[in-house]
């Protein structure tokens, strides 16, 4: 993780990227906020009740005097954000409903990002994934040409660094969805200083098995390659591969001679959410890889979701990643 953070620090130096941390009443989040404030790379905006946050800071012996602290219930920004929210959700949300929703720290924080008063948001230490992602999908929405958001994990051990996706969001994917995830994952790799070599995974390697599931991945490979070419994306996307053919040169030489990737993939697109979620947890628990994420991709502005079992370090690291995404 240290190598990745060094890459991110180079990208973020002098950029003053502002990241909203809605869960300021959580001690892990507040501690991470003070650490971020001390770096000069990421500027945290902390949400919460002032009395509760200041009391927690005293208890933890934290200096939060230089951190911007906003209480959604009493903020001078609320009226402006309510009007903007009603306009964004035209015909779907009344002003009264918006007033109530923006008392919620995740909705308020997401509106800060949408209004350009912050560059990204990190939440989930005390909220479910739905609580974090729902406001983003309603307000920030996906980028043009992208029909869905997806969740990748950075899998890191020593000098090794890989991206696994989608491991968090989409339970059902067709060829178009897999192709989108492949292209967005390649873009994520580029933004984090990687040379993207994207393997689209299956239980088949280059036609070694026949089934509708294999055909789906084969079609996704063609769509992803076409989209990458149209966007002049500096990435190699190939498939379909079994995992060993994607990661072991000797296996690739036997199973996929002549393929664009020869066992040197660093971005892996799984054929289903089941496979991706199981795959990253096997690598984490049996392989000893650090799993950083899920990092959400495909949104107009970055919003990322922590695990409720997260550590201070997780909050800190994901804030750096979110800040780097904001510069894309």
Swiss-Prot record:
GO terms for biological process: acetyl-CoA biosynthetic process. Coiled coil: none annotated. Its EC number is 2.3.1.8. It catalyses: acetyl-CoA + phosphate = acetyl phosphate + CoA. It is an enzyme of class 2 (transferase). Its main location: cytoplasm. Gene3D superfamilies: 3.40.50.10950, Isocitrate/Isopropylmalate dehydrogenase-like. Pathway: Metabolic intermediate biosynthesis; acetyl-CoA biosynthesis; acetyl-CoA from acetate: step 2/2. Pfam families: PTA_PTB. GO terms for molecular function: phosphate acetyltransferase activity. Keywords: Acyltransferase, Cytoplasm, Transferase. PANTHER family: PHOSPHATE ACETYLTRANSFERASE. Belongs to the phosphate acetyltransferase and butyryltransferase family. This is Phosphate acetyltransferase. It comes from Staphylococcus aureus (strain MRSA252). The lineage of its organism: Bacteria, Bacillati, Bacillota, Bacilli, Bacillales. The gene is pta.
